Design a protein with these regions (language model features):
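Residue-level signature of the transmembrane alpha-helical core
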Residues: 26, 55, 95-96, 128, ...
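Membrane-interface helix/loop boundary segments of multi-pass membrane proteins
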Residues: 141-168, 211-216
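Specific transmembrane helices
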Residues: 2-139, 232-278
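Functionally important transmembrane alpha-helices
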Residues: 188-249
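Juxtamembrane/interfacial segments flanking transmembrane helices
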Residues: 70-75, 142-151, 181, 217-218, ...
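Interfacial helix-loop-helix junctions of multi-pass membrane proteins
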Residues: 180-189
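Hydrophobic/aromatic residues in alpha-helical transmembrane segments
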Residues: 104, 137, 150, 202-206
């Protein structure tokens, strides 16, 4: 059966295929995290990163798509990385939205908490470069899976807001090992103080951009990249979460929880979907 995604929604929920996808993505991550945590067994230098890429959410998406839809489905999933019809303004939104929110949160931190608090780190350039490269890698290894494969199928069954929350919980579980495995970039950080609120609020932005670009994955990879290159901005964590919460509420209020797409834009998207389906 042809269940390829058209636009930002799939043609069917595909519960079994979704379960297979999450089993690969979450199971492999758990195994990898445990191997690193217990330092067992001894492995070649490149074994861990290669294993992580192959069985990442993106890797799992291509595996399941290849098994269920063949080469045609794999090519269709890959082509979602670039859509010539994507509006350039959404690429800018993807790159700059979180940076603007972080700057705003940094300024609020100075005003409300400590006027002497420095807004920028001293080594800003190196922080931006490292953050951008790490975020780009993470985006490429995750977004074909979370948004390219799972989100369109979730939106067949639930509205955009509910789909965002459900996917946020699952993808959040996938990230837990980054807080407990030695050598991971977030090892030792306080998971409960930061990640759940940050992730669940931020994930509304992912779905909002995904749906308004008709399922474009380049925009999502850029947005994922932007989550990492703003580390040179000093801010209070809870102030930033508050700023993101307000932004998420505004997005839902203006665009609506059903599709996170304004009605006029949604009609245009539906016409594009019908044209692609014909």
């Amino acid at each position: 059966m042809n269940t390829q995604t058209v636009g930002y929604k799939a043609k069917a929920f595909e519960a079994r295929n979704l379960a297979f996808f999450f089993l690969i993505a979450l199971g492999a991550k758990l195994i990898l995290g445990l191997l690193i945590f217990f330092e067992l067994p001894q492995y070649p230098l490149l074994a861990i990163p290669l294993f992580g890429i192959l069985f990442s959410p993106s890797g799992a998406a291509f595996i399941v798509t290849g098994l269920t839809e063949g080469k045609t489905g794999v090519r269709a999933l890959w082509r979602r990385f670039w859509n010539r019809n994507v509006n350039f303004k959404w690429l800018l939104v993807a790159l700059l939205l979180l940076l603007v929110l972080k700057l705003f949160a940094g300024v609020l931190t100075q005003i409300l908490i400590d006027p002497s608090y420095p807004l920028f780190e001293k080594e800003s350039i190196s922080a931006v470069i490292f953050g951008a490269l790490y975020g780009l890698y993470a985006g490429l290894t995750e977004e074909f899976g979370w948004r390219g494969y799972a989100l369109p199928r979730f939106q067949v069954k639930w509205n955009a807001l509910a789909s965002s929350i459900f996917l946020g919980v699952i993808s959040g579980a996938w990230h837990v090992t980054r807080y407990i495995a030695p050598g991971e970039i977030l090892f030792g950080a306080n998971f409960w103080e930061w990640f759940p609120w940050h992730r669940l609020i931020q994930i509304v932005g992912y779905t909002w951009i995904f749906n308004n670009t008709n399922g474009n994955l380049l925009a999502l990879v850029l947005f994922h990249t932007s989550t990492s290159y703003g580390g040179f901005i000093n801010l209070d964590v809870w102030t930033y979460c508050g700023v993101m919460l307000v932004a998420a509420i505004l997005i839902v209020a203006v665009f609506g929880p059903k599709n996170l797409v304004r009605q006029k834009s949604e009609k245009v998207e539906q016409k594009q979907v019908h044209a692609m389906s014909d």
